[in-house]
């Protein structure tokens, strides 16, 4: 696995544990990050990946490889959790916002994986 994918998955794991801890403890969800990017950076990259990564938006395709396919599945699952959270009437805005950002973060990780797996130097991206 590319290092960016390993590190990103570790960050996603922490993100999920922080949501769980906030739900159980009643405390606020702490600021979360992905590969050193805060929520605003994740938003910027997810909205304009060409500007920040030199990579346009992607549509999941078998040609992108199994890592991106699995990340897309994970992103779909994150969206399902977000929808279910609303449908069951949960009202914690911080958790809902975190779940929403999670799917964006996974999309950014998909983009980073495409960049890394194409042999481009991920350390040179404009973040």
Task: Label every model-predicted segment.
Residues 1-127:
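Phosphate/pyrophosphate-binding loop motifs in nucleotide- or prenyl diphosphate-using proteins
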